[in-house]
């Protein structure tokens, strides 16, 4: 679905922007995470962290991935127990390594990227702005992609949804 969106098909794949690599590394992170959830093997958790580290080096939005996974673990019945194992913590520590070059660059450049990003936000939540953002995404993704994506997220709320479907839905909700 995602690659059908004009931006990802044309803009993210042709122009020199960090979105293409970001999305590739996030997709690899999600694949590794699904394997880690199934196997609970250290190598799968480490792979999740490695791909997340590359994503974190691409763009700040990659930080929504671990936040979404943490929300899933805390808010889904019984999943919090995974936090008692070393796997998620290994993934998180390796993932944070991807921020190291970003932080070092910001230290050397008076936190320029943070000043840029924080200077573009307003002081409070505005429902009209949120609605405008959702409409913009719907147009940006082409109506068919937006509708199919919305249906896929809705399907993830069903009782018979698989762990993989629910987990991917939680990861997708973060950026939305």
Which stretches of residues belong to each language-model region?
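Membrane-interface transmembrane helices that cradle and orient dolichyl/undecaprenyl
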Residues: 29-45, 151-157
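Transmembrane-lumen/periplasm boundary regions of multi-pass, lipid-linked membrane glycan transferases
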Residues: 54, 66-165
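Transmembrane-helix signature of polytopic, lipid-linked glycan biosynthesis machinery
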Residues: 8, 56, 169-176
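Membrane-embedded alpha-helical segments of multi-pass membrane proteins
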Residues: 20-28, 66-67
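Short acidic/glycine- and proline-prone juxtamembrane loop motifs at membrane-interface regions
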Residues: 11-22
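Membrane-interface alpha helices of multi-pass inner-membrane proteins
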Residues: 44-59, 94-96
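Short helix- or helix-capping micro-motifs
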Residues: 1-7, 52, 56, 70
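Membrane-interfacial loop-to-transmembrane alpha-helix junctions, especially the N-terminal start
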Residues: 44, 159-172
């Amino acid at each position: 679905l995602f690659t059908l969106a004009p931006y990802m098909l044309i803009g993210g794949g042709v122009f020199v922007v960090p979105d293409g690599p970001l999305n590739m590394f996030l997709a690899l992170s999600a694949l590794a995470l699904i394997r880690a959830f199934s196997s609970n093997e250290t190598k799968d958790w480490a792979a999740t962290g490695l791909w997340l580290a590359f994503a974190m080096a691409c763009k700040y939005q990659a930080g929504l991935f671990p936040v979404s996974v943490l929300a899933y673990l805390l808010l889904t019945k019984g999943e919090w127990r995974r936090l008692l194992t070393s796997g998620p913590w290994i993934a998180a520590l390796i993932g944070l390594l991807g921020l190291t070059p970003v932080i070092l660059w910001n230290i050397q450049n008076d936190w320029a990227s943070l000043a840029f990003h924080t200077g573009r936000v307003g002081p409070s939540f505005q429902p009209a702005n949120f609605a405008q953002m959702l409409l913009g995404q719907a147009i940006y993704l082409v109506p068919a992609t937006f509708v199919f994506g919305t249906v896929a997220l809705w399907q993830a709320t069903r009782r018979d949804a698989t762990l993989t479907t629910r987990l991917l839905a939680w990861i997708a909700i973060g950026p939305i």
